[in-house]
Amino acid sequence: MASNTLIESTSVRRSPAEHLAEAMAQGSTAGTVQLREIAFATQVGVRAVPGSGGFAALAEAVGTGLPQQVGVVAGSVEGTAVLWLGPDEFLAIAPEGAELAAELVAALGDEPGQVLDLSANRSVLELSGPAAPLVLRKSCPADLHPRAFGVNLAITTTLANIPVLLWRTGEQSWYILPRASFTEHTVHWLIDAMSEFASEPVA
């Protein structure tokens, strides 16, 4: 008799850059520039009009408030953070396993707004180290100077000719969020751009 076996989804899931982990490690240089994937981060799309009941409910439920200025990130990379994408559009990011989408749906109730689990929509890559801005500047048109792009700011820009979300999470660390389908292209470009920092400069 045939039998059915249920397999835990977590045992078979694969992150967009899982197969590139070794290449990212080999392309990284300790103390200079490093690249890794933040796998399976919880990502929730939120839409609500500022001033509405839905906005107030979601702002309270997410625990960080919802940012109301271009580029502002509410919260921090250590916990839940909310990135401003537009006047009524936001992306909440939380650690793997967070039940954020369900919590926000419950909080929204019948108020106007939208909550959507987007965890599979984008990959999350972390580029860190003192040379990280030099790598990004090779293809990113945004002004990355600290006076213009401070810690905990995030923007929509391009990198390697594809659209990405770029979030400065620390003085020397950045989150890069390309669409999942562009992850491999982005990683290979970053590894190539990092290659000049792999060896000590010739005196």
UniProtKB/Swiss-Prot annotation:
One CC-aspect GO term: cytoplasm
E.C. designation(s): 1.5.3.24
InterPro entries reported in the protein's UniProt record: SoxG, SoxG_het, TrmE/GcvT_dom1
Domain of life: Bacteria
Enzyme class: oxidoreductase
BP GO terms, sorted: sarcosine catabolic process
Catalytic reactions of this protein: sarcosine + (6S)-5,6,7,8-tetrahydrofolate + O2 = (6R)-5,10-methylene-5,6,7,8-tetrahydrofolate + glycine + H2O2; sarcosine + O2 + H2O = formaldehyde + glycine + H2O2
Keywords assigned: Cytoplasm, Oxidoreductase
Subcellular locations according to the entry: Cytoplasm
Alphabetized GO MF terms: sarcosine oxidase activity
Similarity comment: Belongs to the SoxG family.
Function: In the presence of tetrahydrofolate, catalyzes the oxidative demethylation of sarcosine to yield glycine, 5,10-methylenetetrahydrofolate and hydrogen peroxide. In the absence of tetrahydrofolate, catalyzes the oxidative demethylation of sarcosine to yield glycine, formaldehyde and hydrogen peroxide.
General remark: Utilization of tetrahydrofolate is probably the physiological reaction since the products are substrates for serine hydroxymethyltransferase, an enzyme which is part of the sarcosine oxidase operon.
UniProt subunit comment: Heterotetramer composed of subunits alpha (SoxA), beta (SoxB), gamma (SoxG) and delta (SoxD).
Protein name listed in UniProt: Sarcosine oxidase subunit gamma
